[in-house]
Amino acid sequence: QNIVDNNRKIMDQTVDSIENYLVNMRQVSDAAYYDVIKENDIREQNDSIHKGLNLLYEANKENLRSIAIYNGYGSLMAAEPVVAQKEEPDVTRQGWFMQAKTRMENIHFSTPHVQNLFDDGTCRYYWVISSSRVVELTNGTDTQLGVLLVDMDYSGISRMMERINTSGKGQYFYLCDGEGNIIYHPHQARIDNGMDTESSVKAASSKEKIYDEYLEKNHRKVMVGAISYTGWRLVCVMPYEIFTNKMADVKQFVLLILLLMAMMLVFVNRMIS
């Protein structure tokens, strides 16, 4: 029970940290939309839009990779930081764009992916989590729908998860979305290579916060925590070996105490006699 309680505390703290991180990203998206996009004409006041996006980026650049505005046809209208767009990326086929257009009332968060929209001249590849939403763009006397993209640096989430995956006892924590797509997993490389599997779809859909399961004949206890707004799940996997090993340690400790008591009794009896 101590193992479960300790892991529950770790999960609660981590859920709070991830939620705070995502709230900050939503606030960036809200500020970009309500304070910049809705206050300026996308064509006549493009400089003001760039300035507003730049201020937001500079204030949050430790956690951001880019902020971009696209029209409904996928054409880039504005972006920060100012870098070259890669040659004709068809954003209309990308998941973050389609999600925003399909469900227009929410901000959507993608699973991690390599950003392939902009070229900053370093020839580096950046892993990001994209948040996207439909926005209303003002163009003179007309309005049109577009998509606001905020790319978060994936390393922020990755560092949070790495900090709690240090026990070395066989247990681990992973993060998935509401459909079971993995966002972070300490064994991701083995899963990608087909050497490991994970029951993330079950964890994502489970209504129970803690349950037992068998995965490839391995008995495990699974604990699930929900990340507000996103539908993400933080999952703790505890192999039953850690519970049996704990019991074995307790038994060894009790036997050691009994042995010491027996030795003390023998010693006392000899002293008396």
Describe the predicted segments one by one.
Residues 1-42:
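Juxtamembrane extracytoplasmic/periplasmic/luminal helical "stalk" adjacent to the first N-terminal
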Residues 119-148, 159, 166-169, 215-231, ...:
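Extracytoplasmic
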Residues 70-82, 180-186, 223-225:
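Amphipathic coiled-coil signal-relay and dimerization helices
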